[in-house]
């Protein structure tokens, strides 16, 4: 059913995330921001987007040939049980690092970043909400 598709997208690792310019952030995701909520970092894969705010993760699944159809998932930090980070090793070709976020419903979301600076900015935002 529809729930399965949602879980598949949420559970699929988002790899090689590249920082998005502010102007390129999905308008529908931006419309979800609340007063006092700000964007910590916005990233994209080849097609999809993930926006980390001061309160939650907003994942945008771009669908269709043009990507105009979108499915948006909101993962609030208050539902996070714990998270883990894996930094790149010396000599790793891509310098990839990964953030794994585990939620109260036993699902986890994985995000792969190029470099480590982005990873720590996002991890700090999550820490502020769950500690």
Regions found by a protein language model. Give the residues of each.
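Acidic, Ser/Thr- and proline-rich intrinsically disordered linker/docking segments
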Residues: 9-20, 65-131
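Conserved beta-hairpin
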Residues: 43-65
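Anionic N-terminal interaction surfaces
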Residues: 3-50, 114-116, 120, 131
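Short amphipathic alpha-helical segments, especially helix-boundary/capping motifs
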Residues: 31, 37, 57, 98-101
